[in-house]
Design a protein with these regions (language model features):
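Substrate-binding pocket helix/loop in short-chain dehydrogenase/reductase
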Residues: 66-67, 71-77
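Rossmann-fold cofactor-recognition segment
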Residues: 21-36
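Active-site helix of classical SDR
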Residues: 90, 124
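Conserved NAD(P)H cofactor-binding loop of Rossmann-fold oxidoreductase domains
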Residues: 58-63
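Conserved glycine-rich Rossmann-like NAD(P)H-binding loop of the short-chain dehydrogenase/reductase
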Residues: 2-16
Length: 192
């Protein structure tokens, strides 16, 4: 039977999601910025040998502040989660993908433009976009699709953490996560 594997640091959020969803959920309480978490997921994949139909890389780390003021641990966090973890999860899952599988990487509209006070975050999202496009081309002959989703600001807990210093004082608009999910699902259903 189909099973949804969900990775998050928060055990409470994972338990709540497991109770909320009508499908079997395997809660994996891992911190994807940690190498041991990525190794544990790779080992679980090797042990279970699942038929992966969809991978969604939606974890995100951001810090909005002047470039020179961003703490080294925040730089490492953005690179580790937004780039390294996403890349290694894609690589770990690929042996279990087949024709019709899809990898969905959440990038950002920030991937396309300079973002003052969000330079490092935007750079990591440009990486996600470029990687998704290139790997998508590589996997085309196997009929495994890679979709980069590039939403505008979205109403999540992310902004409370990323903009803790309050350097961004005005957001033109904030999209509802359900709207982004519907648009993503519609894009996933397209066969191109």
């Amino acid at each position: 039977p189909d099973e949804l594997w969900v990775v998050a640091r928060s055990g409470d959020k994972l338990r709540a999601l497991k109770e909320e969803l009508p499908v079997p959920v395997r809660a994996l309480p891992y911190d994807l910025t940690k190498q041991e978490s990525l190794c544990a997921i790779a080992a679980l994949l090797a042990e279970e040998q699942p038929d992966v139909r969809i991978l969604v890389n939606a974890g995100g780390y951001g810090k909005f502040e002047r470039f020179e003021a961003i703490a080294e641990e925040d730089t490492a966090g953005m690179l580790d989660l937004n780039c390294r973890a996403l890349t290694l999860l894609m690589r770990a899952v690929l042996p279990y993908c087949s024709a019709g599988s899809i990898i969905v990487n959440i990038a950002s509209v920030a991937a396309f433009q300079p973002v003052p006070y969000g330079a490092e975050y935007a750079a990591t999202k440009a990486y996600v976009l470029a990687l998704s496009r290139a790997v998508g081309r590589e996997l085309r002959s196997e009929k495994v699709r890679v979709l980069a989703v590039c939403p505008y600001w979205t109403k999540t807990d992310f902004f409370g953490r990323a903009n803790k210093e309050g350097v961004i004082t005005h957001f033109d608009c904030m999209y509802d996560p359900a709207f982004i999910a519907r648009k993503t699902f519609a894009a996933m259903k397209k066969k191109r």
